[in-house]
Amino acid sequence: MASVLSRRLGKRSLLGARVLGPSASEGPSAAPPSEPLLEGAAPQPFTTSDDTPCQEQPKEVLKAPSTSGLQQVAFQPGQKVYVWYGGQECTGLVEQHSWMEGQVTVWLLEQKLQVCCRVEEVWLAELQGPCPQAPPLEPGAQALAYRPVSRNIDVPKRKSDAVEMDEMMAAMVLTSLSCSPVVQSPPGTEANFSASRAACDPWKESGDISDSGSSTTSGHWSGSSGVSTPSPPHPQASPKYLGDAFGSPQTDHGFETDPDPFLLDEPAPRKRKNSVKVMYKCLWPNCGKVLRSIVGIKRHVKALHLGDTVDSDQFKREEDFYYTEVQLKEESAAAAAAAAAGTPVPGTPTSEPAPTPSMTGLPLSALPPPLHKAQSSGPEHPGPESSLPSGALSKSAPGSFWHIQADHAYQALPSFQIPVSPHIYTSVSWAAAPSAACSLSPVRSRSLSFSEPQQPAPAMKSHLIVTSPPRAQSGARKARGEAKKCRKVYGIEHRDQWCTACRWKKACQRFLD
């Protein structure tokens, strides 16, 4: 323990330090050798030598920090010793040991020169330990020469397999990322959907918004802001992953490998609780083909409808605007697949309800109940081709006008107005779903018009519950100039009868409202 402390703390530690050792700075008046030594250190017998001045020099057992417990003796001329010189251990012969000054003159054999060292920096060859340590650093010119050797520092060597383990871990991370369903996309197709955004902000189901931010012939809005919004990146929008946005969330978050998306007979995805399957329907007039895969519907639009024009730069990604998503139940999905293949399936309904995503503009309690299907205007088409859901607009849609349409039939009911303030009116129109069997939330479009109302809103037959009362329609407060005040009651000529507040042109305190 003592050697460890002396090696770590060096000259700051009192353990092993010389107490009464002579030095050159102390001058000729140094302590005699008969002074008491450290506690626990016993004086050694005097050394016998023919040299008279060296006979009275005893050996002292003083532990110096540089020798790690080795005995420090009175050196005799001709003894083989080791010294630290130039940052390395050198072999030399003792020429003279000045006990009063505490210095030893040593002749270095390899360097062929004579040096004068302190006693702490010299040790005998026969007393050398297996690993002699460097002397402690002293401030001054010699401090640069005596530097600790790196072999005395316990530094663990870096193993060669550590780098390989890092590379292995990096490879495993990259492999896991490449196998993740968030990154997967089939070759030869472009990114069209974002499954992470689809859960909270679904894109239009009739097709993606192109990079120019404009619409196509599908009858939806066109952005007039001029700001282009590129389509979001997607893990290819196969029904396996797009169903997560509209179906119940899965509990399995492990890595899955998607089967070949080019095969139209790919295995059905994991059955969800609501039994809803996402299909893709062609929007080309008089077509209405329904397929399972987004790749198949794109290939169908390119091959049958667009032709060779889709390869040009002008019509690039034009097929994205000619298909939409349709959510069907499991039994109706089989019927749609059979209808696409040309084989009729008995016992299946001919039309399927179109689920419409509910918007969060107003709570459902604040909206009137949807009207019957018979009141809707516009033609309807039988078959699963006619049921098209209305999709939510993308983030590039104009914020001042929200409009959602259900298919090309433009099925809209008579709109009504909700007075919110004298200057802002909210128009809400309902569009019923194509099928009466569907009991989902109806589609509504809300437009805000900032204009003066021509007449108050007519009374509604249906009960309308408005959650927030109109702010600007409080009848308790009288209009400006109608309230009684002293100026109107007494007149200007009888100013002496006014109250003090009216005299100072403040609110009248005598005739309160």
From Swiss-Prot:
Keywords from the UniProt entry: Cytoplasm, DNA-binding, Metal-binding, Nucleus, Phosphoprotein, Transcription, Transcription regulation, Zinc, Zinc-finger
GO molecular function terms attached to this record: cis-regulatory region sequence-specific DNA binding; DNA binding; DNA-binding transcription activator activity, RNA polymerase II-specific; DNA-binding transcription factor activity; RNA polymerase II cis-regulatory region sequence-specific DNA binding; zinc ion binding
Record's compositionally biased regions (Low complexity): 17-29, 209-229, 376-391
GO cellular component: cytoplasm; cytosol; nuclear speck; nucleoplasm; nucleus
Compositionally biased intervals (Polar residues): 45-55, 348-359
SMART domains from the UniProt entry: c-clamp (SM01366)
Domain of life: Eukaryota
Ranges where the record places region Disordered: 17-56, 204-269, 335-394
Location(s), subcellular: Cytoplasm; Nucleus
Residue list for modification Phosphoserine: 248, 376, 449
Effect of residue 172 to A: No shuttle from the nucleus to the cytoplasm
Zinc-finger ranges (C2H2-type): 280-305
Protein's UniProt name: Zinc finger protein 395
Transmembrane spans: none
Subunit structure as annotated in this protein's UniProt entry: Interacts with repression-mediating E2 binding site P2 of human papillomavirus type 8 (HPV8).
Record function comment: Plays a role in papillomavirus genes transcription.
GO biological process: positive regulation of transcription by RNA polymerase II; regulation of DNA-templated transcription; regulation of transcription by RNA polymerase II
Sequence motif: Nuclear export signal, positions: 165-174
DNA-binding among keywords: yes
Tissue expression remark: Widely expressed.
